[in-house]
Amino acid sequence: MKRREFIAAGASAAAVAFVTGCSDNGADGASANGKVQAKTMTKIDNKDYYAGGALDANGISSGKFDVAKAKQAYFDLMRSFNYPVFRAFTDEKFMLEQTKQTDKTQYLGFWATDFAKGDFAKFGMGGVIWVDEIKEEYFGHDIYLLPLQSIAEHSHVAGKPVAANVMQDRWTGEICKKDIPAKMESWLVRHGWVYSFSEVGEPNLDKFPEAKANLSALLYDHKADKPTLLKSLHVEKWEPDGIAHKLPKTGSWHFMMGGTEGAIVTEFANFHDSACNRYTVPNVGF
């Protein structure tokens, strides 16, 4: 079995708070029976993840997103679930060499984003793309969500590769000029739990007040209590029960929100090119 590599906690105490899961834990998180007890993440605040700028009335920041601090929060999330923080997550040079990438246009490896919208606490994600093979057309991805944090609402359309290296098989150098079908995907919750949002299904957002209350103001007007850009009004709670959930309709709008302890979710899909993503919030960036 390969040794799991973990990084020492380097973020400030303000960045991410923990509460211990058991009262008999030692300083190293070990309980009286010798087993390591996971720690529980708490909800984050935008003020801890931006430099400069100010927060508006909705808590959205005009400052510069601190990617390093955001990554550290996800590493802490991983440790809270006893999920390994691999060397490839922390050593970019190693990751690029081992995955035979000449650049990061089609980025394999770990990343953290606020979608360039200043609302990381409610509108952000961490992710790693394990594989994305155009020749054989398959894709593997893990999604990391902090407590009550949402992925940007999005859909997938068919298209053609835009970047030259997206068309190139990384292992053989072969150029694969082919149309890309709309991405179809399924998800398996590994740790924590999520609220799943979809435009397919009966609108039932009011039955999930916690999820509704934590939607970003980019999507929902909380004072008027109505959606602005939000299209996905059917909500389900998915738990780590060994059941995979499939996107109900090709091209449909969807996203996830992490539960109260955050979540780690594995995604299975056909080949994916980010140029084929569409977002309800304008000018989303990575």
Give residue spans per PLM region.
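N-terminal export signals
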Residues: 5-24, 242
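Glycine- and acidic-residue-biased ligand/ion/polar-headgroup-sensing regions
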Residues: 146-147, 160-207, 213
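Short hydrophobic/aromatic-rich beta-strand segments that constitute the beta-sheet cores
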Residues: 151-153, 194-198, 267
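Conserved metal-binding segment of the jelly-roll/cupin
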Residues: 146, 235-259
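Short, well-structured hydrophobic secondary-structure segments
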Residues: 135-137, 141-158, 163
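Bacterial Sec-dependent N-terminal signal peptides
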Residues: 22-32
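Double-stranded beta-helix
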Residues: 201-234, 253-286
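A short, N-terminal "cap"/entry segment at the start of jelly-roll beta-barrel domains
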Residues: 34-139
